[in-house]
Amino acid sequence: MSKRDYMNTSVQEPPLDYSFKSVQMIQDLISEEPRTGLRPVKYSKSGKSLTQSLWLNNNVLNDLKDFNQVVSQLLQHPENLAWIDLSFNDLTTIDPVLTTFFNLSVLYLHGNSIHRLGEVNKLAVLPRLRSLTLHGNPIEEEKGYRQYVLCNLPRITTFDFSGVTKADRSTAEVWKRMNIKPKKVRIKQDVL
């Protein structure tokens, strides 16, 4: 199967589903069997999954150490990973490893322990990210939570399972002007 054929078919492929497996470390996925759904996951001749979706929700992960290496062992084309579900784990930060998947369009992080709103800024480098969930994290209690996320991730079209409207964008822009101070540019003065 060519890469082009893969890109056309794998979007409809079922996810590689490791949800509800009590996984504590990413490395444990290598020895764990994925859950089976209504449709079977397809595999390449080398034994790697031909999907673009990885579900790791409802486990006990507290970090993503070795995530790239493990994903490379599980997926035929890890660079095409488009959907990662890490909801309902014990993550306290948004690991920068997630920003290496430039085709990522759906990222579920709800129900974790992320407590710094600034963590969201890491995701700004993902050009295709359109759907993000963060509700159920301590950051949800921060004043201006929704506006902050929408200001920093302007390409998001769905946030916390709600569509982003023009009114949301407008409110976020007003919030940004009122709450985020522009960085001062220092002018270097020549001393004679």
Curated annotation (Swiss-Prot):
Subcellular location as annotated: Cytoplasm
Could you tell me which InterPro entries the record lists for this protein?
A: Leu-rich_rpt (IPR001611), LRR_dom_sf (IPR032675)
Where are the annotated LRR repeats, by residue?
49-71, 80-101, 103-124
* Residues in coiled coil: none
Major subcellular site: cytoplasm
> What are the UniProt keywords, alphabetically?
Cytoplasm, Leucine-rich repeat, Repeat
Q: Start and end of every LRRCT domain?
A: 137-175
Which cellular components does GO assign to this protein?
Answer: axoneme
- Specify the protein name: Leucine-rich repeat-containing protein 51
- From what organism does this protein derive? Rattus norvegicus
